[in-house]
Structure formats: structure tokens, C-alpha cells
């Protein structure tokens, strides 16, 4: 309510602002918003998205009253007067701008009446003089607020069919305040110049994206940044337009309101993943269809549909493909919204719809068959667990499935029997795990979880005092394919095809985001709205907005029978045994359809494993006889095949399939705000911490000095002493010299070394490797190299007995083990 009033005042102010420009007046304030963050893109679904960061700079500029266009014209008149009447011009020696303009005014009036130029200001003030005297150096600001709001505008057919609600603006608009910044709440004076205020907000990942819903695209979801500034007009507080005396503050102080609205485009992008593989079976026939589709679909693009039909040929009958047609359907469900004044009317309408639905449920359900071009199908229903839009778990049977048709049509009449697939998409929900057919416990647990989620969703929607939904189903794209597939009738037969699904005509209305907005910019009304005809997928139970898409594919197949050219059916000897063997082979080679419904993994689990032929299985034959026999067989087979023809029986079937499509926007870089790499130290110019190189070098140097495991002596001791003396000191238990610095030894637990190998030095001819174990570590003597940065690295200067568990870790260091 508050924002609607602000919008109305903003419109009135805007009209007043345009009128004031005509009168020669200008606003003392200008507002501008600059967005510094990348476009607001929500990566991932509503459940897993981390949101998007919106940050920018809000600037309030107090306009300098002496730098306007009128002052420039005043300066031009001053220059003209100075050239024509140089003797009458007064040269100003003051530094202030006011005195210079007063002097120019006196010079300008001297051109008109030179005799009274000295008394023109005091006796007869002009409008220019009054304007300059009414100048200001600061403005009193009472409040400055910035808000990010979500606006939902409802339009037909998503407005309830009640006349009072269709004319109420509060029922047709829903505004939600997402974030508000109280920049200034107390009265404060702002001087002439620009005053900037930074803002930042993390947009939640569960909010719906900016979109236009419905066939007319008038129902819109949009986001706006609204800046509101209230101030006291300084022009009214100084001088009146017709008098030279200043007004009183109590009578002249009037608050003005200035508002700026900037649209924020919020889009959702689901990253591209692996393609979806779906399997459909069509009992009572032996046809199975496997389809491959991308997991996401973008507007203004095309995507391939790969399909393979198996079980086309069986015995003396086979199916020949005639046509493939496809269409993309968009289903939009919007919850009814009403203001507090009309809530009782919405409840009455909801009760009426409940009564109608209960009466319809008693009657047998009849399927609507679509023929030709149909407009959007609109239905009003009350939300419940049965019709709640939600994503099913894999393996859950569909509730809306009708019983399959039985038997083909008669051979005399050409009938098209509809074949509905038994199972839906197994990967409707991205990231869903596969459930094994025998794992009933896991299946029941997942079903219970989904049931609880639906109950919570229904309770959450019932809290909103409305469960009335308007559903619109419309076709947004369609096409057909009449040729271009490959057919193979060998063995069980198969049909393979690849077709392009055209979505180039779909437009979601996404354009370049607005990065700057100001009150100085006039709103552009000449541009026409783009023809928006699709909306991306939305699942928002809080607002009651659901948008989903389905790819419906229909394949027409005609039945054919095989017979000889003379019209006689194909009959082979031992028909009974042959039928039994054919049935056995069919049961073996055909996939188990029940398991095929669950996963393609079990489709070919009964395929026989052919044993490889060994040399004992091959029997020698005469080459002449074999060639003669094979030639006879080839000739007989060729003759028989040439006499066999296929005759259409007149029966046909329509194989209908539905695949869920996820329509989303392109991801661009595809990097969310929480996955971006932070700036390195060198990018921070002011007060930057030390760079990585210096810190790493210092850390290595300190580590080298701290890990010394032997005493270090000074250079004087190296001159007078030797390594043997130092060894004697340690063996006798005597203390070393006074200049020797003792360093503590850090002993770490070392792992047991692997088996070592060495050559036998005695025999040079036999240089075979022999495995030996490591020697006892108590008697190992280590010779430490010299201290770094002192002479040579490998020059030994001290020896010492070190009791350690292992010596293999020292092989890669600068120590020499003996």
C-alpha cells in the first residue's frame, strides 16, 4: 500500500517536474543509482542456489543554483554589454560570485536607463535579481530511503472472475519489500555537491526470476530499486515571486518528495549437465522407445532429439514408421490474490469451485482429444495433494495415467490406437539417485519424505488464506518429421532418428541489464515491448507461481504383414515346434518390460551369452561340396526373399510420449558469487598487506634455521678446532666450548621403511638384486652438512649419534648417511 502511494506521488511529481521545466523552474536535487555488481543471475535450482549479490552506489546531488543555463545566458548578456558600453561597466574587485553577478546586473540596467543605474537594485528589483538573491548553498533533507521491492502484476486470466477484483488495483498488484536502507531519518542540511551512499544486498536463491507469464505476457514478476528523498524546497523559503521581502519560515516551508525507480533484472540459470536418457514401453506391443535429451533448454536455440525404436519386427509382422510430430507445452499455475477488502469474495468463489469439482469427480472422466489449432486451455481449481505440481521421485507410478488400449485395430478399417507410455521420466528431478527395483524400503522412505514435503507445502499455502489456482496450458512450439529416419527389420528390428527441436521463436524478454538510472533521464516510451512468448521454469510455493514445460512426441506406426507375391502366407515346416522355439527365443531375446520400465540397465539382462567355438567344434568338409551347397542356399534364399512382400494390414498406432523440459537462461560465465576467486594482495593498492613472495621467503628462511638438529659453532671455533675434536667431546660426554650453540632436536615418528635392495660387491659377474632388511637404527651415524649461507653445503663439520626410528626420510635431504 505504501509503495503504491509512493508510485502515484512519483507520477504526480514527474508531471509537475515537466510543467516546472516549461515554466523555467528546475529541481534542486538529482538522484542517480549506479550498479557496480555483475548481472543478478541465480545459478542452480531454487533449492540449491546461493543467490546473487546486488551492490552499487546511490548518489544525491544538490544542484548549484548559479551554474544553470539562465546564468550562462546572463553571462552572455554581460559580455555583450561590456563590448557596447565599456565606459559604464563596473569592474568588480570582490571574489564572491554574488557580487560579480550584482555588478553585471547594474551594468545591464545602465544600458536601459543610465541615469537611474545606481538605484535600480534598491528601488525596482527585476526577476533575475530576485532569483539570484533567492540562491542557496545548502538544502534541508528530512529523509533518504532506498528499497528493493518485488512487484507482481496480475492480469487476465490469472485474476479471479469477479468484477470488483478485476477493477481493484490492490488486487491486481502485489508488492513485497525485500530490503530497505534507512540512509537518513533525521533532518539534515546537505551542501551543494554530490553525496554518495553505497548499498549491498544478497538476493535469495529461492525467489522467482523476472518473467512475463501467460499467453498475453501481461502477468509480470519484476524487481525494482526505489529511492525516495523528502526535502524542503529552498526556492519557497527565500523570496516570493512577486515581492522583494522574504517569506516567513513557518509559512513557506513545504516538504517535497523526489523518487527514482530502477528496474533490476533477476534471471535464473541451471548449469548444463549430462544428457537425460529415457525409456518408454508400449504394451501390448513389443515396441520400446529410448530417447536422449539435454537436461536444460534455452530460448532462441535448437536442441537435438535422439530416438530409437526397438521391437519393430516380430515373426511375420512388422511396424513401419509414417510420421513423427512434436510440440512443447507450457503449463502456468498462479494462485489467486486479493486485497483485504475483497478477501471474503475470494473465499466465496473458492467454495463454489470446490462444489463444482466434487460434482465433476462423481462423473466418469473423459479425455479431451486435440484436433487442429486450439487456443490456451484455462482451468480454475482448488489446490490439493492430488493436483499439486511437484516433481515425482524415480520409479513412482503416475496418478493421472489412463488404462492402456488393448489390441490393435481391425484389419478392415484403418484405426489409430493411442499408446500411452507406462512410465514417465526417470530423471525429472536432477540429481535424483537410482532406486533398485528390489529395494522397497528405500522406495517407501523416499515416498514418505515426498508426502511430508507435499503436506508442508500445502499447509504453507493454506496459511496464505487462498488455495484457488488458475492453470493455463498452451503450445509454444511445434513441428513434425515425415522422413529422414533409418529402418532395419533384421532380427527384432529397430528405427533410429535424430531431429532438431526448434526453439528459435521463443523469447523470454531478457535483455541487457540497466546499470545506471537518474532523474535527469527521461523515460523512453517510444520503444515497443518485445513479443514475449515463453517463461523460464518457476517453482515458488510461497507466492504460488509454477511454470513447467513438457515435450510431447507422437509417432505414427503402421502395421505390415509378410507374405509371398502370389498372396499366400508364409508357412514353414514344423510350424508348431517353430512357434514354440520362436516363443522361447522371443522370451529370451526380448527385454523384460517390467524391468525395462525401471531402468535401461535391465533391458537386455536375458540376452543369451554365445559360447565361442573351439577347434574341436569345427568338422572338416569337402570344399567342392561346400561351395556347391552354399551357392544353392544363396540362390534359394535370394529367390525366396525376392518373392516375399510386405502388405499393410490397415492397422496403425500412435505412440505418445511426454518428456519434461527444463527451460532456463544461458549461464554466461557460470560462476556464482561464492565461487569467485578473491583478489590477490597486489590488487589492493591502498594499505595492502605484504605480498605472497616475501611472506613465503621469510617462512622458508625461518623454517631452515628452526629445523637444525645439530649444535652450531661460531667461525672462531672452526679456525682452531677440527671435526675429530668435536667428535671426542661427544664420545667422552664432555661439554663443548663456550661458543657452541645448542639447538633442540625435533624427533618425529617415522614410518617403517620398505625392503631395500643392494648389489653384491664381491662378485662382479653376478649383479643380481638381493633383498635385505634395514640395519638396526641405534648404530647409525649421521654427518650433518654445513650451516646454510656458510661455505659449502656438503662440507661436514660435526658428527653426532642420533637415535631415530628410520633413516629413509633423510635420503631426499642434504644429509649424508653412513
Swiss-Prot record:
One example GO MF annotation: ubiquitin protein ligase binding
CC annotations in GO: cytoplasm; cytosol; Golgi apparatus; Golgi trans cisterna; plasma membrane
Polar residues bias (residue ranges): 402-413, 620-629
A Pfam family this chain is assigned to: LDB19
Expression induction: Expressed periodically during cell division with a peak during M phase.
Compositionally skewed regions (Acidic residues) per UniProt: 416-430
Modified-residue entries (Phosphothreonine), positions: 93, 619
InterPro entries to which the protein is assigned, alphabetical: Arrestin-like_C, Arrestin_domain-protein, LDB19_N
Annotated stretches, region: Disordered: 1-25, 352-374, 388-436, 568-590, 607-644
Glycyl lysine isopeptide (Lys-Gly) (interchain with G-Cter in ubiquitin), cross-linked positions: 486
An individual GO BP term: cellular response to amino acid stimulus
Residues bearing PTM Phosphoserine: 384, 808
Keywords per UniProt: Cell cycle, Cytoplasm, Golgi apparatus, Isopeptide bond, Phosphoprotein, Ubl conjugation
Entry annotated with the keyword Phosphoprotein: yes
Bias (Basic and acidic residues): 352-361
Cell location: Cytoplasm; Golgi apparatus
Assigned protein family: Belongs to the LDB19 family.
Purpose of the protein: May be involved in protein-linked oligosaccharide phosphorylation since the deletion reduces the negative charge of the cell surface. Involved in the resistance to EDTA, cadmium chloride, cycloheximide, 6-dimethylaminopurine, methyl caffeate, beta-chloro-L-alanine, caffeine and cerulenin.
Further remarks about this protein from its record: Present with 295 molecules/cell in log phase SD medium.
Identification of the protein by name: Protein LDB19
Amino acid at each position: 500500500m505504501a509503495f503504491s502511494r509512493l508510485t502515484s506521488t512519483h507520477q504526480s511529481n514527474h508531471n509537475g517536474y515537466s510543467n516546472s521545466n516549461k515554466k523555467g523552474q528546475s529541481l534542486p536535487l538529482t538522484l542517480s543509482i549506479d550498479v557496480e555488481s555483475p548481472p543478478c543471475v541465480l545459478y542452480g535450482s531454487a533449492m540449491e542456489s546461493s543467490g546473487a549479490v546486488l551492490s552499487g552506489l546511490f548518489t544525491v546531488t544538490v544542484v548549484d543554483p548559479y551554474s544553470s543555463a539562465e546564468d550562462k545566458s546572463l553571462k552572455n548578456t554581460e559580455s555583450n554589454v561590456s563590448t557596447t558600453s565599456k565606459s559604464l561597466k563596473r569592474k568588480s574587485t570582490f571574489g564572491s560570485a554574488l557580487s560579480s553577478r550584482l555588478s553585471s546586473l547594474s551594468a545591464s540596467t545602465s544600458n536601459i536607463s543610465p541615469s537611474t543605474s545606481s538605484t535600480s537594485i534598491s528601488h525596482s528589483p527585476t526577476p533575475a535579481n530576485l532569483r539570484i538573491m533567492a540562491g542557496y548553498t545548502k538544502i534541508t533533507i528530512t529523509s533518504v530511503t532506498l528499497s528493493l521491492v518485488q512487484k507482481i502484476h496480475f492480469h487476465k486470466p490469472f485474476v479471479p472472475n469477479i468484477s470488483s477484483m478485476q477493477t481493484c488495483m490492490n488486487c491486481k498488484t502485489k508488492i513485497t519489500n525485500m530490503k530497505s536502507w534507512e540512509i537518513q531519518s533525521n533532518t539534515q542540511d546537505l551542501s551543494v555537491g554530490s553525496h554518495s551512499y553505497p548499498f549491498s544486498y544478497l538476493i535469495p536463491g529461492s525467489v522467482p526470476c523476472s518473467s512475463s507469464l501467460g499467453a498475453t505476457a501481461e502477468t509480470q514478476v519484476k524487481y525494482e530499486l526505489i529511492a525516495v528523498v523528502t526535502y524542503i524546497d529552498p526556492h519557497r523559503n527565500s523570496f516570493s515571486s512577486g515581492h522583494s521581502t522574504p517569506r516567513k519560515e513557518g509559512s513557506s516551508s513545504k516538504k517535497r518528495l523526489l523518487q527514482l525507480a530502477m528496474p533490476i533484472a533477476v534471471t535464473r540459470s541451471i548449469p548444463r549437465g549430462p544428457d537425460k536418457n529415457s525409456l518408454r514401453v508400449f504394451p501390448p506391443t513389443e515396441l520400446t522407445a529410448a530417447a536422449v535429451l539435454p537436461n536444460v533448454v534455452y530460448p532462441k536455440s535448437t536442441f537435438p532429439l535422439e530416438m530409437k525404436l526397438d521391437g519393430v519386427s516380430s515373426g511375420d509382422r512388422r511396424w513401419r514408421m509414417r510420421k513423427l510430430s512434436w510440440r512443447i507445452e507450457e503449463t502456468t499455475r498462479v494462485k489467486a490474490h486479493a486485497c483485504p477488502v475483497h478477501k471474503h469474495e475470494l473465499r466465496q468463489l473458492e467454495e463454489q469451485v470446490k462444489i463444482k469439482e466434487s460434482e465433476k469427480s462423481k462423473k466418469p472422466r473423459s479425455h479431451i482429444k486435440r484436433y487442429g489449432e486450439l487456443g490456451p486451455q484455462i482451468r480454475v481449481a482448488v489446490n490439493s495433494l492430488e493436483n499439486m505440481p511437484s516433481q515425482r521421485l524415480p520409479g513412482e507410478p503416475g496418478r493421472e495415467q489412463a488404462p492402456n488400449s488393448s489390441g490393435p485395430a481391425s484389419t478392415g478399417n484403418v484405426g489409430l490406437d493411442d499408446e500411452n507410455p507406462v512410465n514417465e521420466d526417470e530423471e525429472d528431478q536432477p540429481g535424483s539417485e537410482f532406486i533398485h527395483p528390489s529395494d522397497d524400503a528405500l522406495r517407501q522412505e523416499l515416498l514418505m519424505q515426498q508426502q511430508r514435503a507435499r503436506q508442508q507445502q500445502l499447509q504453507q499455502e493454506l496459511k496464505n488464506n487462498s488455495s484457488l489456482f488458475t492453470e493455463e496450458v498452451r503450445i509454444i512450439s511445434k513441428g513434425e518429421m515425415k522422413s529422414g529416419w533409418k529402418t532395419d527389420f533384421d532380427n527384432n528390428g529397430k528405427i533410429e532418428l535424430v531431429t532438431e527441436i526448434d526453439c528459435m521463436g521463443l523469447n523470454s524478454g531478457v535483455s541487457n541489464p540497466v546499470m545506471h538510472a537518474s532523474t535527469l533521464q527521461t523515460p523512453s516510451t517510444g520503444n515497443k515491448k518485445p513479443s514475449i512468448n515463453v517463461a523460464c521454469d518457476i517453482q515458488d510455493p510461497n507466492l504460488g507461481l509454477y511454470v513447467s514445460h513438457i515435450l510431447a512426441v507422437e509417432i505414427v506406426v503402421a502395421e505390415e504383414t509378410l507374405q509371398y507375391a502370389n498372396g499366400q502366407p508364409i508357412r514353414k515346416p514344423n510350424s508348431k515346434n517353430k512357434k514354440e522355439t520362436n516363443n522361447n527365443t522371443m522370451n529370451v531375446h526380448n527385454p523384460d518390460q517390467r524391468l525395462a520400465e525401471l531402468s535401461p540397465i535391465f533391458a537386455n539382462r536375458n540376452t543369451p551369452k554365445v559360447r565361442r567355438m573351439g577347434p574341436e567344434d569345427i568338422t572338416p568338409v569337402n570344399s567342392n561340396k561346400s561351395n556347391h551347397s552354399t551357392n544353392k542356399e544363396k540362390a534359394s534364399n535370394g529367390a525366396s526373399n525376392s518373392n516375399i512382400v510386405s502388405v499393410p494390414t490397415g492397422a496403425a498406432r500412435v505412440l505418445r510420449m511426454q518428456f519434461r523440459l527444463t527451460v532456463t537462461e544461458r549461464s554466461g560465465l557460470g560462476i556464482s558469487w561464492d565461487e569467485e576467486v578473491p583478489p590477490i594482495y597486489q590488487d589492493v593498492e591502498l594499505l595492502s598487506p605484504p605480498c605472497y613472495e616475501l611472506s613465503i621467503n621469510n617462512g622458508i628462511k625461518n623454517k631452515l634455521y628452526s629445523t637444525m638438529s645439530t649444535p652450531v659453532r661460531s667461525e672462531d671455533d672452526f679456525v682452531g678446532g677440527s671435526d675429530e675434536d668435536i667428535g671426542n667431546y661427544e664420545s667422552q660426554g664432555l661439554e663443548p666450548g663456550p661458543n657452541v650453540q645448542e639447538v633442540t632436536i625435533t624427533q618425529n615418528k617415522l614410518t617403517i621403511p620398505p625392503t631395500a635392495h643392494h648389489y653384491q660387491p664381491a662378485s662382479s659377474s653376478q649383479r643380481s638384486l638381493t633383498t635385505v632388511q634395514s640395519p638396526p637404527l641405534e648404530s647409525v651415524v649421521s654427518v650433518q652438512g654445513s650451516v646454510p649461507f656458510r661455505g659449502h653445503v656438503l662440507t661436514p663439520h660435526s658428527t653426532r649419534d642420533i637415535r631415530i626410528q628410520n633413516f629413509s626420510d633423510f635420503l631426499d635431504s642434504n644429509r649424508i648417511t653412513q
